């Protein structure tokens, strides 16, 4: 691939570069040096086509779309879903885009808002562990709603999804891992960039307009961590609101509204707001050659992804040993910093329970699964579960924390009353590229989440 490097942002405009060959079907774009990542991403969005996507990337995009739609349909009849759809119907917006799980249409921003929030509610949306992004929830709702509105094809849906994943994950990687070492949930602050990228691709916007749209991406909310600990509904809006913002920014840019051309890299830009460390080279390295969507981790459990290694380690102990839950004296969980905060032993809401490693481990031991119904409000009153959760101690393990974020490790130790001890360490939770879910497992997950709403026969 030929690459033309431009260092002057003032001439980083729409440039058509043609190459004599493509390397592994990679995207033909003009690259701008690392000090201009906002403009680089704008060009990537504008220039990328379906033909640029390798076969395995297309397949992965289909998996991601199916997974997200299943999570959204599953969350459509939760209290969050019902309240949001009721509110949106009261707004009487144009009937442009379908809200999954409902025979309701709304304007694209509102439909994407609902879809993202509903998908976030069940804690089943995908995660990129290296960027700490939830790329599906911040990208696919936008792509779905706008492709329906604009009457686009399935290929357009796939392309806009891949582009959104690429942009939001690369920005996330540039400020990781310190992004999760704070009281602000910075990933949600960045999610609008995925929505913006997807929207710009659906609209077919040129580089200049894409850059302006990205330059408005800081309008996403300052998403603090407290709602996760409190277990309140607003945390689900962290998944929905960036889609609303992203569509709005893209439409405004399409009409001529301007944003910062250096929003990501400026000394007053978004990177310096969300992280103490950043490396912009990760934004442009191999852009168009490797695709971040391939690094998505799919969730097999309805809980915060940071808890999954501990859940897997618990299941591994149970597979190897016959353990009587009544004989458990204590359970010790050492893990990385961001996961060690999930230490609540007595969650009072289903949301809080999904962010509790002690509760999840108790479910694994007593119920043999950690799925949607295990987080029902009535289950939170189960004295056996609560009593076992109180025996779980979660703490920061400095050695394991040094492996973060290339690994998300957890070491679980179970000690019985007779003194016997059992342990297991998991470095990559099930569903990561190193331990992937099969196509059949992803399909089964979709059926499990969606069938209660649309029926298995559909």
What is each model feature region?
Residues 4-132, 229, 234-244, 251-458:
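Terminal-appendage/accessory-domain detector
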Residues 137-144, 189-198, 244-248, 309:
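Well-ordered alpha-helical segments within folded domains of soluble proteins
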Residues 64-71, 143, 190-201, 361:
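Hydrophobic mid-domain F-helix/FG-region of cytochrome P450s
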Residues 150-156, 173-183, 196-213, 224-236, ...:
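Active-site cavity-forming subdomains of large catalytic enzyme subunits
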Residues 163-173, 214-225:
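Long, well-ordered core segments of solenoidal/helical folds
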Residues 120-173:
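Hydrophobic alpha-helical hairpins/lids featuring a short glycine-rich hinge
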């Amino acid at each position: 691939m030929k690459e033309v490097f431009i260092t002057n942002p003032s001439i980083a405009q729409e440039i058509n570069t043609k190459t004599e060959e493509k390397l592994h079907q990679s995207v033909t774009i003009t690259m701008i040096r690392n000090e201009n990542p906002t403009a680089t991403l704008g060009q990537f969005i504008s220039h990328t086509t379906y033909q640029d996507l390798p076969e395995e990337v297309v397949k992965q995009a289909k998996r991601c779309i199916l997974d997200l739609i299943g999570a959204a349909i599953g969350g459509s009849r939760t209290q969050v879903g019902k309240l949001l759809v009721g509110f949106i119907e009261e707004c009487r917006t144009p009937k442009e885009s379908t809200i999954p799980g409902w025979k309701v249409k709304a304007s694209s921003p509102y439909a994407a808002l609902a879809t993202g929030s509903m998908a976030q509610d069940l804690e089943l949306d995908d995660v990129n562990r290296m960027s700490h992004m939830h790329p599906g929830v911040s990208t696919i709702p936008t792509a779905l709603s706008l492709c329906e509105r604009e009457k686009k094809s399935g290929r357009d849906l796939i392309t806009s999804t891949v582009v959104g994943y690429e942009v939001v994950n690369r920005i996330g990687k540039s400020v990781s891992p310190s992004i999760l070492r704070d009281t602000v949930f910075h990933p949600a602050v960045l999610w609008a960039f995925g929505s913006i990228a997807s929207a710009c691709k659906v609209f077919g916007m040129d580089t200049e307009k894409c850059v302006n749209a990205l330059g408005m991406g800081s309008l996403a909310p300052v998403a603090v961590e407290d709602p996760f600990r409190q277990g309140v509904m607003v945390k689900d809006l962290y998944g929905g609101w960036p889609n609303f913002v992203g569509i709005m920014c893209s439409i405004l840019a399409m009409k001529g509204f301007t944003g910062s051309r250096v929003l990501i890299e400026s000394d007053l830009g978004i990177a310096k707001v969300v992280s103490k460390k950043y490396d912009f080279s990760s934004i442009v390295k191999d852009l168009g050659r490797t695709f971040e969507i391939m690094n998505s981790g799919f969730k097999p459990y309805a809980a915060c992804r940071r808890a999954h290694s501990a859940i897997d380690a618990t299941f591994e102990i149970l597979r190897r040993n016959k353990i009587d839950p009544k004989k458990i004296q204590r359970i010790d969980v050492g893990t990385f910093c961001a996961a060690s905060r999930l230490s609540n032993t007595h969650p009072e809401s289903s949301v809080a329970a999904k962010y509790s490693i002690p509760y999840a481990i108790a479910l694994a031991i007593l119920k043999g699964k950690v799925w949607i119904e295990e987080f029902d409000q009535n289950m939170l009153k189960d004295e056996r579960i609560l009593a076992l959760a109180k025996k779980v101690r979660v703490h920061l393990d400095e050695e394991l924390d040094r492996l973060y974020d290339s690994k998300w490790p957890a070491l679980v130790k179970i000690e019985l009353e007779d003194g016997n001890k059992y342990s297991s360490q998991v470095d990559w939770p099930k569903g990561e590229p190193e331990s992937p879910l099969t196509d059949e497992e992803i399909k089964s997950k979709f059926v499990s989440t969606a069938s209660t709403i649309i029926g298995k026969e559909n």
